[in-house]
Amino acid sequence: MKLITLDFETYYDKKYSLSKLTTEEYIRHPDFEVIGVAVKQCGTVFQETKWFSGTKEKTKEFLDQFDWDGSLVVAHNAVFDMAILSWIFGIKPKRVADTLSMSRAIHSIEVGGSLKALAAHYQLGEKGTEVINALGKRRIDFTDEELARYAEYCINDVELTEKLFKALLPKLNVTELKLIDLTIKMFSEPTLELDVDVLDAHLQGVQKKKQDLMAKIEADKKTIMSNPKFAELLKTHGVVPPTKISPTTGKETYAFAKSDEDFRALLDHENEDVQALVSARLGVKSTIEETRTERFINIAMRGTLPIPLRYYAAHTGRWGGDDK
C-alpha cells in the first residue's frame, strides 16, 4: 500500500474561520475556498512533494492523478483535510491516518497536539508561520511571490507530517490505527440524513412549551427573581438547587448567579422545563434544546450528518465529542 501525505490551505478571515465555526460549518460554507494543496506520494518509487493552486476544477484534476484507492493517506488533524477531500472533491481514500490522533494516544497532553509542538518534540524541523499572512486573502489576491512562500509553507507541513507519522507509527498497533481510520471516516464520509420536517416540528413543540411556561412565570416575576421561590420551583421539577458558600457572610447560599457553573450546567438539563426556567433566570433567549435542534436543522440543509468524535480524548483512551 502506498503512503500519501497531504495538507490543504484554505481561505479564512476574522469572521470566517475554524475558531468561529465548526469544521462542518466552515467547509460547507459558501465562502469556503482551497488556496492550495500539497501532496506527497511514496510507493515503490520516491516522489517529491507536489504543490498545486488553482480553481476547484483544476485542483480536482491535480488530485485525481494520485492513487487514493490503494493508499494510506496521512494528515495532521485529518478530519479537516479528509472532509475537504471527500465533500469538496469526492475522493475517499482506502485508509486514513491522523498524526494528531496518534499523538494523543502516545503523549496525551504532555507535548501538545499542534504540528509545531510535536515537530519540535521529535526534532523533525521547524513549522513555518506563513499562514498568518494569508488572513483575508482569496487565491486570486496572492502575488506570485506570496503564493510561492505559501507553497513552501504547505510543503514543509507535509514533510513534517510524514516524518511525524513515521516517528509515531511504531508506537501504535494495527487495531488502534484501524480505530483512528474509522473515527475520521465517521466524520469525513457521513451517511446519516436528518429529517428536516421532524426536526422543525420538534423545534416548534419545544418553543411552544417554553412560551407556555414563560407565560405562567410572567404572571409572577417575583418567583423567578426570588432565590427561595426559585429554589422551590426547581424542586418541583426534581432538581436540587445548587448552593455555594457566600464570600460575604461565610454561610451557605443559593448558587444562582451567571458565574456559578453548577447553575449554568442546568441549561443542559434533560428536562426542557428546567432548561427554560434557568434560561429565564439567566436572561438567555434560547434553551440548549432549541439551539441544538436549530444546529441539526442547519446541518441537514447542508448535507448529511458528520459524527465528530475525538479519538483518545482522555487518558483512559475513551472517545470524546468534538466540534458542537
Give short role names for the model-derived ranges.
Residues 1-2, 64-67:
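A short acidic-Thr-Gly-centered motif at the start of a beta-strand
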Residues 20-25:
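Short, conserved, GDST-rich strand-edge loop motifs in beta-rich repeat architectures
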Residues 62, 80, 84, 295, ...:
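Aromatic-residue hotspot detector
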Residues 1-9, 14, 29-31, 36-38, ...:
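Conserved "right-hand" nucleotidyltransferase catalytic core of DNA-directed polymerases
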Residues 66-69, 214-216:
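Short, surface-exposed connector motifs at secondary-structure boundaries
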Residues 13-17, 51-53:
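Cytochrome P450 core scaffold surrounding the K-helix E-X-X-R motif
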Residues 15-17, 83-88, 233-234:
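A short acidic (Asp/Glu
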Residues 32-61, 68-169, 176, 180:
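Active-site-proximal helix-loop-helix substrate-binding element of RNase H-like nuclease domains
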